Amino acid sequence: MKKLYLFALLLTFVSCGTKPAEKQIADQFMAFSDESDSFEPIKAAVKDKRIVILGEAGHADGRTFEIKSELIEYLNTDNEYDVVLEGMGFLDAAVLQGVLPPLCIDSNYLDVANAWNALWSQTKETSSLVNAMHSGKVRYWGMDCQPSLSDYFLIPYLMASSPCVSSVLAGNTFDSLMAIHDRIIGMDTTLTHNELDYFDAKMNQIRKALEDETDMEKKAILDMAIDNALAFSGQVRLGFTEWDAQNEGINIRDRQMAENVEWYLNRYPDRNVIIWTANFHGAKQISQINYGKEPDPDLYNKYVLLGEHLEKAFPGQVYSLAFTSGGGSEGYFYANDSTAIVPDSISMEFQLSHRGMEYGFCDLSQRKDWTDLVFYSTILGYDCKPGKWAQTFDGIFYIKENHKAHEINR
């Protein structure tokens, strides 16, 4: 694989004369001194797309969070979009949006700032978006199958939501299922396959019992909540320590996130969505990027991620926008330190940093001549990799100076 990429890079270099592909790409970016000036060109690029994916190079990019929040509010001026969030569970959103009643879910914790993962919701940089969602100005939904607020109430919620479920959870079954589920949420590595089999079987029995539920919307949402619980159970079954298991777990999660989005769009056919996630999950063909590291240089060939699933389900209706930076720093809001962002000298970001622009946008989807162009970029976690990026993302947003996320006191 490495030899093939080197050959492709050589062909790219020859076809571009003496100008490296990275500089060729960088020279085509529209430059902006203020980030808001880029929003109208982005709006034009995503026009008529039902799904807009907004990524981030890392989950600690404060300036990226800020710009994504501003961009969402700009694109949603006339309520054209709902926001679908990585880091928020499927059931959380159904309850928070009033589609299902809270029942046994503690109302003291029932808030978007608690239900959305703290990596984003507890930062100053997303505060305007969180406030807009909290006030009802922006509609939202959760797409994650990772443990979130409602998961801690899932078993009692299922029991309280429908009389059909009571018979499945009679006797000691409720306590046994609760105990196993708590350990699943805690990613307990001592869980046995028998215990996980028991959990999966009972969840499927609950699903079967819900066939008698007469409220079709409730039934549909609870059915998806069970799907999400089983998806995470599948990740726990694989484990989080072995290399192959971790990577198969990524595929399980991305497939379920895509199914959650697909369910939402099919359920509400008049709605469009903006998805908040990482560049990695937004990749439409991650296999076109060369991972190139041991122990598995061809790792990306094994992934089918959120963006790719959605492109297959909604062909031509997905625009995936990656965010990247040419300098500054990144850091989690809860950490005192930060890490400098220093683009590799062979990367597109290095070339962009020498153009001197504060912000930049490039609509890759309009450059069909770049489809097979191989160039180096740090789009995925600020790690410099070669690949056919125009097959992986539809657009790139460049930030000259990023900064760490900052905690907000609510």
What is the predicted role of each segment?
Residues 16-410:
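Structured catalytic-domain cores with a bias toward divalent-metal coordination
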Residues 1-24:
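Bacterial Sec-dependent N-terminal signal peptides
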